[in-house]
Structure formats: C-alpha cells, structure tokens
C-alpha cells in the first residue's frame, strides 16, 4: 500500500519531469543511413565527406517537437554564456549559409523551412533560432585552460543527461557518468578537439537501445539509470550522428547531434 507521503513524493517527482506526464506520439525513422550501420569503438571518429547538416524523413515531426520544447522547457533545453554569444552568432551565420542547399528558402524577413514554417532569424537569441531551424542539437565547446568547456547549447533531444548539470563544465566532467569514457578516452578526445581544423568536420555515432521512443529524455546524473540501460533488448534503437567542426573566427568547437529513433523491426543488420 502506498502511503500518503509517498504519494506526495511521486506527485512532486512528476512535477519536476512534466515531459513524462504527457505521452507523445512516437517520432520514428524508418531508415538508417548506410554509413551508420556499422559499429566502432569510442571515439570512432572519421572525416565527414557529406553534408554536416541534414534534413531527413522525420524533419517535420521532430521540428514540431522541438518547437514545443523550446516553448515549454526553455530553461532545460537552452544555455548560453554571455561570453559565448559571438561564437553562437557565428554558428548561426554558418548554418544560414548552408540551408539553401538543404531545401530552405532564405528571405529578408526570415527562413522558409522544408516543413513550411517561417522562422524569424533572431541574432539576439542564436541558440533558440538554431533550435527552430534544424533537426540537430548544437553544443558549443570553447577552450579554457587545458580543456574545452560547454559554453552554449540548444539541446532538445538529450539522451539521458541534463544540460543544466553540464553547462559551464569541461569535457572530463561532462562524461563522468559514461562508463566507457575512461581517462585514456578522455585524453584522446581532448587531443581530438585540439586538432579539429576549420573546414574539415569530423563525425561519429553512438548506438543505444531504449524502452521509450521519446526524443526528450533528460536525466540527472543523480537519478537512477534508465530502465534497460546497457541492454540491447529494448524495442527502440536510438542513435546520434555527432558532428564536430571548428568555427573560423571564435575557434569554438561545435558539437552537432542529429538523433534518429527506429523501431526494432526497422533496424537493418549492423555489422
């Protein structure tokens, strides 16, 4: 029997995780790109030979979810240090230059997106504007002392981490809960960040099985691990295409995260 006190605690927990109280229609991909059908050890980095920004079959549905999250969960999905604003604005300008090749229309009064939405370009809110234009999330990392630090982000589709806990922290702190991210991998990733060159983006991807297809899955490092973590028996396959590139003026590193979720039946054989 549940005590009254336990009931109140449960209600409080739900209040702090409102996204769990409103089930959404699953936003699923039906296809997995050919170059994401293999497995590689961390960090599994390779040169990006195609476009680093993409528009795919789930664009419309994912963008509707992003718009809703930017309205309802802005404090959880947006972060920008004032000192990082020039880098964020530089990233926005770069993204705008890439959009016409992806089917966007650039007009004096804003952007016409592939799903028909008209988005005003607000340079005073660069991360929010990026979140309204693109499927992928963007994380800004800038070098401070010996490490890159998270100085800005739009993170609508977190996979079991919370932006507010990682904001302003260095790479090693950001990856502390990840079991595979040991000291050797941390050193390799920091060397990788130091070596990223302008105009030569790199990419990798991860592979996780989830019980829940919801794209917005923030989880505190202090909360229990999600159900099914480290198991390959879940009904949904979640993978992130993670692209790294360096901005020319600010020298910031951009971490672009394009999320795909597939039902198990639609996942092709992985080699």
Where are these predicted regions, by residue range?
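Extended, well-ordered protein cores
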Residues: 16-271
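N-terminal amphipathic/basic-hydrophobic helices that include classical n-h-c signal peptides
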Residues: 1-21
